[in-house]
Amino acid sequence: MNNKLIIVTIITVLVAMVSVSLYFLGKTKTANNKTYKVGILSGSDIFIPIVDGFVKGMDKLGYVQGGNIFYDVQKVNADHSAFKQIVEKFVDDKVDLIFALPTEPAIVAKAVAKDANIPIVFVGDIEGTDIVESVSHPGENITGVRISGPQSAAKRLELVHEILPQAKRIYLPYDKNYPITSATLELVRSVAKALNLNLVELPAESQEDIIADLERRDRLPDIGIDDIVITPNPLVTMPLSWQAITTFAQKHDLLISGTLVNQINNGAAFVLTSDFESMGEAAASIADKILFGIPAGSLPLETPTLHLRVNYSQAKNAGIELSESFLLKVDEIVR
């Protein structure tokens, strides 16, 4: 009887200790009276859902906006000089952490904030850049969430071939100056060669370049392309570029393989990408570790899962019959 009483007492004490520990663990962010300042730089409006996911994730972790954490959110559309000015202001303001996205702003943030020893969390691609040392050990004062843009572009090319094996001329517009373009092209060209596909490349420097090329093709007896694969770079997904691409595709019954979630309801027959809000929440989890003292460069990059989404009506309008084997791979069908 005494043994049973002792065991019950021990269990009760242990449960109480765990409960108290969990309570204070949850209260730590406010109990230590520390206030954090986080500078957020988004290089394009299309990535705002990632920022929203980041803030939401920080809320879940116990950070209270206007209480123990303050955000300076700066949104710029593909303006490299503005990226630098914004990060310089973050440095002058002595923020505790910088959250930068996508690739270009992250590269600028790393360079500008290096001497200030401000940790950086980013969401972006790493291929073809020196932004990190490796996936497992980013190094220096940076870590984050990897988008895997080149890999998704290559996989989408394979999916296009699976859906429409007769389509041999694949239109590939891209920003020739974007940091990951070379790495993307190397991978996509390799896949195209293996599948015996002809990439009709358009190296562009502006939205006007894309618009002009599509207008030129529209006047030809043969437009010279069978389908369109969108590469991971902001230029092609900016409003004027995207409007021109979707209008052209609709007129000529072309399939568009997109690279952003919102494109599934805006002209793309299918997209293969990670969920933006989830990426933001993953970045928040990393930021939390850094704010509690773990060196940024020691935290491995996170690589989120790619999800295949299909707009069934869009595919049908383009005259495409989706096979059962293809549909089995789909994570979400929009009708």
Predicted regions mapped to residue ranges:
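Short hydrophobic alpha-helices and adjacent helix-cap/hinge residues
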Residues: 1-335
